[in-house]
């Protein structure tokens, strides 16, 4: 069955590239989630405290890629204890988050985070909320690292390579 989940992993360029390489992911799109303004621009999200998170919309086939596995792969490319910071990127828009549209996904998300927490001394900082809003990012952000292969990314090439084999 095809499903959709929204994941914030810091800068959305790397998150989009990473998730798009995973077998079972059908499509990805970057945008802005769960902020306080409608139809924000990148400049507004970066400079005007809109509350939006840079987020990747992930459509996937859960018969090929169960949500549990998708979340485990997500945890491999973030620091789940870091608040509003991933790699060199800092700000509320770079927070980590799992935004669901299907309430049943909580039955998978919560135990997954409990397992993750056992691996860390610090508390897990991943925000888990129902998706309230998602606005597509500007076209130049879509598939950014495919268009700009040497563009900045906090997720390394090794992670991209392992995503292809996941």
Swiss-Prot record:
Its EC number is 1.8.4.11. Pfam families: PMSR. GO terms for cellular component: cytoplasm. It catalyses: L-methionyl-[protein] + [thioredoxin]-disulfide + H2O = L-methionyl-(S)-S-oxide-[protein] + [thioredoxin]-dithiol; [thioredoxin]-disulfide + L-methionine + H2O = L-methionine (S)-S-oxide + [thioredoxin]-dithiol. Keywords: Oxidoreductase. Transmembrane segments: none annotated. One of its GO terms (biological process) is protein modification process. InterPro entries: Met_Sox_Rdtase_MsrA_dom, Met_Sox_Rdtase_MsrA_sf, MsrA_MetSO_reductase. Belongs to the MsrA Met sulfoxide reductase family. Has an important function as a repair enzyme for proteins that have been inactivated by oxidation. Catalyzes the reversible oxidation-reduction of methionine sulfoxide in proteins to methionine. HAMAP family: MsrA. This is Peptide methionine sulfoxide reductase MsrA.
